[in-house]
Amino acid sequence: MKRKSLLCLLIICLLLASFPGRVEAATFTPDLSFTGSTASCYVSIRQPGKKITATMELWHGTTLVDSWSGTGTNSLILNETHSGCVSGWTYTLKINGTIGGVAFPEITETATC
C-alpha cells in the first residue's frame, strides 16, 4: 500500500513539473490620435516566448491610407505617423498578424481627425 501511494505521489509530482505554472495571454495596446493633420499610429503586442508578426493599417472608410509591418520575439512595437489627414474625417487603425504562427483576431481603433 505504501509503495502504491509513493508511486502515485511521484507520478503526480512529475506531471505537475512538466506543465508551466501559468500561461500568459497576449496583450495588445493600440492607439490612434491626431495632432493637426498628422495621425499617430501605435500598437504594442506582447507575448513571452513567441514570434510576433503584424501589419498596422490606417483606413478612411474603404480606402487604405497607409500601412506598416514588423516582426519581433516576445514583443513588437509599431509607432508610425501619417501626414495629410483631413479634419473631421474618421479614420480606423487595423492591426492583423500572427503570434507563434497563429493568426490573432483583427484589432481596431477608430478616431476622428
Question: Which residues does each PLM region occupy?
Answer:
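Surface-exposed, short loops/turns at beta-strand junctions within beta-sandwich domains
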Residues: 81-90
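N-terminal prepro-regions of secreted/extracellular proteins
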Residues: 1-36
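Intrinsic-disorder/low-complexity, polar/charged segments enriched in Ser/Thr/Lys/Arg/Asp/Glu/Gln
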Residues: 38-42, 77-79, 106-108
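Short beta-strand elements
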Residues: 103-113
